[in-house]
């Protein structure tokens, strides 16, 4: 326990609420969310790529998806296959799926793309050898596996300012983070001043197979420590 118990939980995605409910159900415990949470804002989870790299893959005219990245990751020529040997191998930045919304959404997106389905994933989908091979190929390109996207974007901006080689070829982030980065504000601080935009901007590429959204739910907790007055006040 760190501080007072919360009355409201606002995770970046409703996916975390579903995971919590599943864990509670497995222990025969009641759900902690009161009603259906409202969404405060919505932003898609995208591939953030240095603009020249995205253009080399055909952006914005040609669709780019998880399978595009898998094929590039598996190609021993790396970026040389797209006439840019100076960029080396394709590298991916991705946060830990147990700690970060974009990392979780990215992992789910990989499996959806690998199976080609848009309906609920089944255990047989996840254990399919072909599916697992595609996901493993994508994950093999992950050279930086951090805790938050802010770490990646800070390092990307530092690399942009100091060298001509991008920190990573692509990083999985929320679209809003791309907007902030291109302003020279990779941490997204509301009161940031004296910003210097990057020399090479990032572009937000929505996976052609489809993407998940961070819906930022406002969830009022239905817990023993929450009083009726607190519940009413939180509404």
Which residues fall in each region the model found?
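Soluble non-cytosolic domains of exported or imported proteins
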Residues: 3, 11, 41, 63, ...
């Amino acid at each position: 326990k760190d501080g007072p118990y919360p009355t409201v939980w606002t995770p970046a995605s409703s996916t975390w609420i579903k995971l919590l409910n599943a864990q509670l159900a497995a222990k025969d415990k009641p759900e902690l969310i009161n009603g259906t949470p409202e969404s405060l804002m919505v932003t898609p989870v995208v591939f953030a790529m240095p603009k020249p790299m995205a253009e080399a893959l055909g952006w914005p005219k040609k669709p780019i998806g998880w399978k595009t990245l898998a094929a590039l990751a598996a190609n021993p020529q790396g970026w040389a296959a797209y006439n840019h040997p100076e960029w080396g191998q394709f590298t991916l930045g991705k946060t830990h799926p147990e700690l970060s919304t974009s990392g979780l959404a990215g992992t789910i997106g990989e499996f959806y793309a690998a199976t080609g389905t848009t309906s609920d994933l089944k255990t047989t989908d996840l254990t399919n050898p072909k599916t697992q091979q595609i996901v493993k190929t994508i994950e093999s390109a992950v050279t930086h596996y951090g805790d938050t996207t802010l770490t990646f974007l800070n390092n990307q901006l530092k690399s942009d300012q100091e060298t001509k080689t991008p920190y990573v070829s692509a990083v999985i982030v929320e679209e809003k983070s791309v907007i902030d980065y291109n302003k020279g504000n990779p941490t997204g601080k509301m009161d940031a001043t004296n910003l210097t935009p990057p020399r090479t901007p990032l572009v937000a590429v929505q996976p052609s197979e489809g993407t998940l959204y961070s819906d930022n739910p406002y969830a009022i907790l239905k817990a023993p420590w929450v009083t009726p007055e607190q519940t009413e006040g939180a509404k």
